[in-house]
């Protein structure tokens, strides 16, 4: 097992449903934080991040950085949603990476399905 654990509450996502992700880092070295990159394949739409570790946010972007200083016990939880109406089924790629001095140390990928 690696230094990064990443889970989603569900890989079956629907419009405006809450997406909850949990991240755990056991990397023994120094690191700056984790970054979550999300791509809705075959679409130019973005995920909307709602919060991380109980801190409210609203960013219409495909990337969220969580600083190590805001990760008690090297853990993070984020919530997000996708708001556009899916006219087809989309594949959503979530990629979480440990970042140290602008370099990626390790990453995990989860694919989810977005549909009506």
What are these regions (language model features)?
Residues 1-116:
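C-terminal beta-sandwich interaction modules and adjacent acidic
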């Amino acid at each position: 097992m690696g230094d990064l654990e990443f889970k989603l509450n569900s890989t079956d996502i629907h419009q405006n449903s809450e997406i909850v992700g949990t991240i755990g880092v056991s990397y023994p070295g120094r690191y700056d934080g984790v970054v979550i990159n999300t791509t809705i394949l075959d679409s130019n739409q973005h995920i909307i991040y709602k919060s991380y570790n109980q801190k409210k946010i609203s960013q219409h972007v495909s990337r969220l950085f969580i600083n190590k200083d805001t990760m008690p016990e090297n853990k993070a939880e984020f919530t997000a949603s996708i708001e556009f109406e899916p006219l087809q089924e989309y594949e959503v790629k979530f990629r979480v990476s440990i970042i140290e001095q602008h370099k990626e140390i390790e990453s995990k990928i989860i694919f989810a399905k977005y549909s009506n």
